Curated annotation (Swiss-Prot):
Encoding gene, per UniProt annotation: potA
Topology versus the membrane: Peripheral membrane protein
Binding site for ATP: G37, P38, S39, G40, C41, G42, K43, T44
UniProt xrefs under Pfam families: ABC_tran (PF00005), TOBE_2 (PF08402)
Catalytic activity: ATP + H2O + polyamine-[polyamine-binding protein]Side 1 = ADP + phosphate + polyamineSide 2 + [polyamine-binding protein]Side 1
Every ABC transporter domain range: 5-235
Family: Belongs to the ABC transporter superfamily. Spermidine/putrescine importer (TC 3.A.1.11.1) family.
Coiled-coil zones: none
Function: Part of the ABC transporter complex PotABCD involved in spermidine/putrescine import. Responsible for energy coupling to the transport system.
Enzyme Commission identifier(s): 7.6.2.11
Molecular-function annotations in GO: ABC-type putrescine transporter activity; ATP binding; ATP hydrolysis activity
Protein name per Swiss-Prot or TrEMBL: Spermidine/putrescine import ATP-binding protein PotA
The species this protein was found in: Protochlamydia amoebophila (strain UWE25)
Source domain of life: Bacteria
Amino acid sequence: MVEGIVFEHVSKKFADSIALNDVSFAINKGEFFSLLGPSGCGKTTLLRILAGFEKPDQGRILLDGQDITKLPANKRPINTVFQNYALFPHLTIWENIAFGLRIAQRSETEIKREVEQMLGLIQMKEHGHKKPDQISGGQKQRVAIARALVNHPRILLLDEPLAALDLKLRQKMLLDLDRIHDEVGITFIFVTHDQSEAMAVSDRIAVLHKGSLEQIGNPIEIYEMPKSSFVADFIGDTNFFDGWVKETAQKEYSLVDVEGFPQIYCFNDKQLSKGDAVHLSVRPEKIHISREQIQAHPLQNVFQGIVDDVIYKGDHTHFGIQVGDRKISVNQQHSRFLLDEAPIKWKDVVWIWWHSDDGFILERCQKLENNNE
């Protein structure tokens, strides 16, 4: 028996709109798993199908080997935390957490034990007597999580639970969610459109786009080894190049002719031939910048350019560097700051460089007219 959740060929339409298109993947038991994508990608629909609030048009859902596709929502060992908290304003925090236990007709001794345990888990033992309007937004979210966990579900669904919180509070709640997950050990499924949230807490991430699964992997795989242009662009910033394979070097690397730009060496894990049209990506933080000319090493990309944009962002400075017909984004991290160090300025002539391992071929493009042969 496979432990965890399995989606098998799940499809869903609303009128003429395709919400999910033949989606298949598995979530391991006990994982902190994120469904990530822009609005309308299908992530919330997938969550609602798992919760039992929607039925798929095709496909099925397995939980620990059992088909739960037709099981009513109230029969599934799954609880959901929503963005709006949905706390009862007339009940205390203690009573809000106890509500589900009372519905289940648990004994008062058991209710007291479970509620006190949950208050300890969310670090709010001293707030049990308060009403929801007497606590902060972050505390309300923790109470909503405790209320969802008190009945010991096998799966907790989190539907954009941090969207209403400010930045600092979201960062604090992410740490709380990670800690709570580690302590309770059940499967958490986290829906978000915020890449940084998913990257911070997830064991694995499923990236969805227009109802289809683009990629699934751990945060490092998703960021460093995107499988498509959409994933590379949605997860952080990147520079894209279209070109043709001119030659292969040492099997793992290709030299690519790029229109309006010098040739680029890049990592290649695909079966490509000379003349193939390809799509390349290199992250701005992988590119180095200097006023001094750099001696190019084998398989290193070194180019001269002119600074067109300079934007100071605190922990790093963003540069737009004009090289040939292209403007290249470069992010220089600030490992130290010296008052007497002359900063790179607008219209400065600079050198930028990156190793071929830091640029990668995402996919083949449709055949372009190649005048380089």
